[in-house]
UniProtKB/Swiss-Prot annotation:
Name assigned to this protein: Translation initiation factor IF-2
Gene behind the chain: infB
Top-rank taxon: Bacteria
PANTHER family noted in UniProt: TR-TYPE G DOMAIN-CONTAINING PROTEIN, TRANSLATION INITIATION FACTOR IF-2-RELATED
Keywords per UniProt: Cytoplasm, GTP-binding, Initiation factor, Nucleotide-binding, Protein biosynthesis
Lineage, top ranks: Bacteria, Pseudomonadati, Pseudomonadota, Gammaproteobacteria, Chromatiales
Amino acid sequence: MAEDKVREFAETVGIPVERLVSQLEAAGISGRGPEDPLSDLDKATLLEYLRKGRDGGEQDDDQAPSKITLRRKKVSTLKMPASGGGGSGARGPRQTRTVNVEVRKKRTYVKRSVVEAEESKHDVERLERALIEDRKRAEERARREAEEAEARRREQEEAERRQAEAEALRQAEAEREATAETAGVADEADKAEPQPDPEAARLAAEKEEARRREEEKERRRLEQEARREREAEERAARKTGATAPAAKGKQKKGRESLSMGAGKPGRRGGKKGGRRAASGGEAAKQLQHGFAKPTQPVVREVEIPESITVGDLAQKMSVKAAVLIKEMMKQGVMATINQALDQDTAVLLVEEMGHKPVIVRADALEEEVLQDTSQAQEGDKAPRPPVVTVMGHVDHGKTSLLDNIRRAKVADAEAGGITQHIGAYHVETDRGMVTFLDTPGHEAFTAMRARGAQLTDIVVLVVAADDGVMPQTEEAVRHAKAAEVPMVVAVNKIDKPDADPDRVKQELSQMEVIPEEWGGDVQFIHVSAKQGEGLDDLLEAILLQAELMELGAVAEGNASGIVLESSLDKGRGPVATVLVQSGLLKKGDSLLCGTEYGRVRALIDETGKRVDEAGPSIPVVVLGLSGLPSAGDDMVVVDDEKKAREVAEMRKERQRDKRLAQQQAARMENLFNQMKEDEVNTVNLVVKADVQGSAEALQQSLANLSTDDIQVKVISSGVGAINESDVNLALASNAILIGFNVRADAAARRLVQENDVDLHYYSVIYDAIEQVKNAISGMLEPELEEHIIGLAEVKDVFRSSKLGAVAGCLVTEGAVRRKNPIRVLRDNVVIYEGELESLRRHKDDVTEVKSGTECGIGVKNYNDVRIGDQIECYERVEVRREL
């Protein structure tokens, strides 16, 4: 080991330099100052002295006490006056009593050698640790020196080897040249093979071998010295552990020896020590968990979509929601756990909490799925049938026209003879296939007609020749122009006597729908749905328009389309009518429709037959979705059902966040609207319909019935039969149950009868709207109307001591009654409103004075009546209000 100075060794051990010098002198090492060197032998001598001193101190402690406690007791007396007195009147000597007082003192004296021994023990431990560290440093130094020597040896061997090879090559070259010069001197040299002299190579190899043996001997010598030094230190450490006394009292057993590695239990123990204790300690250490408390904050990458709730953001940062809400309060933002935050606010909060925000697009996965679908549809486009939407006003014969084309009787089966949902059919003709979409004509089905115009190729506008252009006809024209879809006008009912096709052309031309005969681009076809007249011309016009448009679609790959209608079938579950726009829809495909997903269990065409696949422009009913998609949602086929589920759930979450944000924005408005709610009556409705489109149309139409005095609220709207939950909701909210083409199940009917819930069934949307309108009208408060019943003109003014000014009047119109209110008019301007105080004729009080009769009128609390004024008498009448 390297020699240290006394001062450096004192710093290593951790004791003052003066104490180390005194301990060295006590150990017999004298004449050492702070700057003098201290060898390993001196350190071992000092350690041995300190150990002996500690052992001797402990033996002295066993023979003599380490501390002495002295107790001293001092007893004295104290006289105190006795309590109580002598006789009642006698004054005798004062009595006293004696009290013993004992004072105890206790002092403890500690032997100074015990303190010194304790300090010496600490010095020994520090010295042992210092020696162990020195040994480790020496081993590390020896290892490094051995590695460096080995590296130098290898480098030297490599250099000598290269030098020997070069020398041997030079000698061989010289010998070959000498041999070539003497080749012609003798014939034996010509016949013999020229062999180089190996003497130089042999000498070089012997030299190299001698050098290698010398280096190997030096390396072994260094390793033996290091090993001997290490063994000597280990023997000294084992000797230290053997001479150390056993611990007394309740000291820990299995004390670690200096020679043992870290973490290994000692062999020697107390009475219960030994292998069992050692193995127990080993097992306990193995059972310890490896968790370590973080020394610095954990920074997470938090993915933040466009909108996120407070609870979800706290979960992503692995903090409690209360902690995040407190942080938001510090930033001046008040929010609840379910409130949605925008992306910028969430980024600021994440940065404030010490994490790293990562902005993600909420529609990234959705775009990936749609891109995969579009790539799967790449290919050559094939001609496809045109999609034709039939639009027009109600009762203009749209469904009857389609029935005649399809040779079916759909209109007769419609409730009320009107269409109330989109019907989709495809028809085989001589010139090709055509897909027809029949839309409702009633004003309540605006959304259905708009959807029909968006997904169609051609619009057939049906106009009755006897009615002309009606409101829904104008609306259909607007939808077609907004969707930039070509139109074909079918002038229906031309077989009626009062039919006027020219008037239809005139009215449509005012809406910029110009016939071809007038120089426009719109075909006008005269048809009769009942007689079947003009149907071939209509089909020919449709197919001609389709040929001009050159319609085409990819017929292979994943299908995509749009949802026309959805309903809840009791035996089939959620079913959706979809129109395939491209690709091939097959049974077993994974489907994504808006916020719903599923696997296609069955495909059914409009005739009720099951089919295995459906191509472009073919409408089919799909079974197997997880729920009811909304009409108008896009339909795509995806390769992975898991991705479809993730996209559907993400869309639902986006809708939920949007709804929560709208609710939060409406809270401030509600604060002001709550003051008016007591004045406004509310009609609550629960609507259940057979299909999604009908429920949507009925909900919108009923909500539009609201007025300033009565508000109509559709608190729930759904598809399917009326169940118990609908009845319970109507009970809780005091609502009216409306079933549109659906009925209540047995449990719901029983609950309705028990609780007397207002339940109504409708099959025609007219009846539903009309009856709700009548119910609302009955809740309206009647209006008060004023009817003028008489008019009197002031001819003169008299003064009365009792009544003040009395007007002498002539009744010019109607009659003046005493109990009715009056108005005083001057120059046809009302200057006073009040009531009559007296009405007299010839000094007699009367209740009524008719036209053409003079009378005296006293106006209550009004004396400024002048000649020429008019007194108007009127009555208030309650009138029933209607919507």
